[in-house]
Each structure stands twice: as C-alpha cells, then as structure tokens.
C-alpha cells in the first residue's frame, strides 16, 4: 500500500504523506506538462527549469515550480536515489515526489491555497518574484527566473581567499538583487555586502552568503545569522500569482517564495540527507489567518506497494518504512531487497510563533519564550484514486480538500480518528 504523507506547520506546519496504490493515477509520460499547459489561462508560462542536487550519497532533482524528487521531464519516475548512482536505471529511490503547500483565510474568511502535486490537473506556482506594490507577476520576469541557481561553499571559499580573483560563473551570476524599477525586492538571493551599498557586485568583493569565516553567529533570538547553507546549494524564486490555480482551483494568495535546497558532504548520517529552506513573503495587502505550511510527500521506499507510514510527535518527524524485511523489485520499480531502510521527513525549524499566544508551540517545557518556533502540528495521509478506499480519503481536487488535509481533516471535513484507516472510526 502506498500513501501520501502530509507534514504541517500551523504558521502552522504539516507533513502530508500521500499513499498510493499500484496504478496510483501517476501522470503518463508527457501528460503532466501538456494537460496543464492547456488550462493555464493567465500570463506566465509553466515552470520548466530543473537542476540536480547531487553532492553526497543522495541524488535528486528540484524544479522551478517548487515540486521536486520526480522525473517530470523524463519518464515520470521517482528521482530521490539513496545511494546515489551514476546509472539511474540501476538505482533505488526512496521518494517519488514532494512539494510545499500553503493555505489560510483572509480577513473576510475567504480560503486561499497554493499547492503542487503531479501537475496532472495544473499548477499553482510560477517562477520569479512579484511586484511588491501590486502583487502582480510579469511574464517576462517569470521567464527570466525560470532557472535554478547553483553555488558551492568551496568556490565561495576560494573566491574570498583569493580576494575576489578566483571568480566563477556561479558567483558572477548569483541573483543578489531584484529589479527595483519593476518594484521587486531590493535583496533577492542572500549575499555578503562588503561595502554595504545593498547592491550585489562581486567586483567589490560581494559573495553568496555562506559563513565563510565560520563564526556561527546568532541573532538576539538565538537563530543562526547565516543565510546560505550547505556545501552545495540550489536557490530559486517562485510565486503563486502568475496565473490561475489549476492544481487546487483556489484563489491566489500573493506569495513570493525564496527557496534553497542544499546538502553537506560528510562521513556520518548527514551524508544521506538533503535539506530545504523556504523564505515566504506575503506580497498581498491582506493578512492571512489560520495559515498552514505543509510539506506534501509522496514517499516511495523502493517498491511502492509494501510501505507503511508513521509519525514521531516529539521529534516532529514523519517517516516511511517497509512492511516486511524484504523490499522486492516489481512493476518496473527497483526495491532495496534485504534490509530496507527507513526515510524520515522533519521540520528542523518552523516559523516564529505569535508572541503571547499561550501555546507551547515547540513542545518544550516553556511557553511564549523569546524565539519560540512552531513545530509540526499535523500529520495526515490520503490515498490515491485507485482501489477500494472511501472517496473522502483520496486525492484532493478543490481548495477546501487541500486545506482540510493540511489541517487534519478528510475531504468531507470529518476528523481523523483512531484505528483502522482513520476515517469514520
């Protein structure tokens, strides 16, 4: 059995795992892009860019629309290989797809949601920053930012050590600034501003904002001041206002998201991990209430019909593991064979909690302490549209379905219950 997992932060956070079955309604080759392109009626073109994150024992891929871990432009197969392999045909993947979901209510109670899954029905995200004045997306800007920028810690170290002489194309082309003539944010990708002129210029010594001096400085709330992470980093910008929300059928929020995917090369367990950071800006003129940030995960641990999912509440960790000691190769999918691993999905740091809300958001012994962050608040799953499952527990198709899954309810707004399949118990 295969389920879709949802981890949620109640900004708030959620982890959502989707559980699929054999046929799972995955997109056929080419279906996702063509079916979606016919439905997008707004200005920006669908996101197309992708880039591999492949530094340590993980080989995976991310897309400029915020979705990741699957081969959208190839054979629509899983693309999160552990261990990393040169020949993907011989590799075993532990996840099929993933994306960030965000939803909430405006002051009038109108639901606004942005999400991505398999692009079968459409998309809710487009590349590029938004106009900070009127929240609009410019098709030319979307096209310009339909790319993923890559940089490594080693090349920045070398740049600084050589006093700016050893400059690489990655450093030179780093998108440090938005276009203020188009009302974009002055700062875009994080960089160290040597002369404090707010303008990214490697010729004056500016560089992508790794902690080159290894100071590990923290701000007044105890958070790391460093803005760029990893030994290798991918950076991209996307928004939810570049067109009609054909994935969720929802109302756009006006979000600009600056994302990082990064990895470390180590000799311990971190060598089997990848990390993701999202800086979310609400560019609209309204406040979003009852807001949830969700990591949607279609986790396939090798062969996808013998997996279970679970949640460690204290750690805020969603996980997937094999149902038996042997993960077979079947239905064109490579399994892990003997001693299959488990895969975890964790929120290391959520958003800052509202001060004085009286809630122990980080589940420690203190309430409303300075710098308190929100940890995972929901863990849910749903079944793909295949098999004898109650229809209320299957794929979401409209905005309220997505929001219900993010907030711990089924599509019909009934709560998850204890025991069985968690529906109607």
Residue ranges of predicted features:
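Bacterial Sec-dependent N-terminal signal peptides
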Residues: 1-24
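A long-range scaffold signal marking pre-active-site subdomains of enzyme folds
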Residues: 19-425
